[in-house]
Amino acid sequence: MTQQFYVSPEQLMKDRADFARKGIARGRSVVVISCEEGIALVAENPSPSLHKIGEIYDKIAFAAVGKYNEFESLRQAGVRYADVRGYSYDREDVTARGLASVYAQSLGAVFTAEQKPFEVELAVAEVGGNQSDDHLYRLTFDGSIADEKRFIVMGGQADKVAETVEGGWQQELNFAGAIRLAMKGLVTDKEAGELPASALEVAVLDRASESTRGSRRAFRRLGDDEIAALLSKEN
């Protein structure tokens, strides 16, 4: 007769959490920084096509670490949610807080009910009219949600990267300064003094997109040449 093994709910949840954390720890870090000109999103990502950063809606962006297929499915679901809500109600009704709540419900349901949890950590960012109106939300594998201030760091070396970003963050940072600060954090654990532009994925949420580009869409992805030029600028 086969012996049945009992696993307590506490142990089951702990095992699931440990499993998810190990998967996330293998991922390269992502930094999201609120600055004077908007919000900068910087990821260590040598792939030119498998993006860890993406646009969700007019002033909302998404960043993630972990398993690509899992966070990409969440990004696509977020885009569909935003499009439907904006069409059904009003574009102003699509907010980072609403999207983060939807993600939290999905992650929490998978963590408790499915065979395995998602090995992902997410950031949802919304740029405001001024820096105090920016919204940064961090979501973990179990559906926990945190309203962060100034910056978010995710990934395997998050603590070390966050220490560097914390020490260099200033309210007056422009995009160039924020991107350089993020890169400085990302190379904290590396022998090389800097990462090449081709190893970085960078996007911004431009606070002044309507006045400078005549567009509600604040999200803009930077190419290698523009990243290299920004990294060489004096703040």
From Swiss-Prot:
Gene3D superfamilies: Glutamine Phosphoribosylpyrophosphate, subunit 1, domain 1. It is found in: Cytoplasm. The 20S proteasome core is composed of 14 alpha and 14 beta subunits that assemble into four stacked heptameric rings, resulting in a barrel-shaped structure. The two inner rings, each composed of seven catalytic beta subunits, are sandwiched by two outer rings, each composed of seven alpha subunits. The catalytic chamber with the active sites is on the inside of the barrel. Has a gated structure, the ends of the cylinder being occluded by the N-termini of the alpha-subunits. Is capped by the proteasome-associated ATPase, ARC. Keywords: Cytoplasm, Proteasome. The formation of the proteasomal ATPase ARC-20S proteasome complex, likely via the docking of the C-termini of ARC into the intersubunit pockets in the alpha-rings, may trigger opening of the gate for substrate entry. Interconversion between the open-gate and close-gate conformations leads to a dynamic regulation of the 20S proteasome proteolysis activity. The gene is prcA. Belongs to the peptidase T1A family. Its main location: cytoplasm. Pathway: Protein degradation; proteasomal Pup-dependent pathway. GO terms for molecular function: threonine-type endopeptidase activity. This is Proteasome subunit alpha. GO terms for cellular component: cytoplasm; proteasome core complex, alpha-subunit complex. The lineage of its organism: Bacteria, Bacillati, Actinomycetota, Actinomycetes, Micrococcales. Component of the proteasome core, a large protease complex with broad specificity involved in protein degradation. SUPFAM superfamilies: N-terminal nucleophile aminohydrolases (Ntn hydrolases) (SSF56235). It comes from Arthrobacter sp. (strain FB24). One of its GO terms (biological process) is modification-dependent protein catabolic process. InterPro entries: Ntn_hydrolases_N (IPR029055), Proteasome_alpha-type (IPR023332), Proteasome_asu_bac (IPR022296), Proteasome_sua/b (IPR001353).
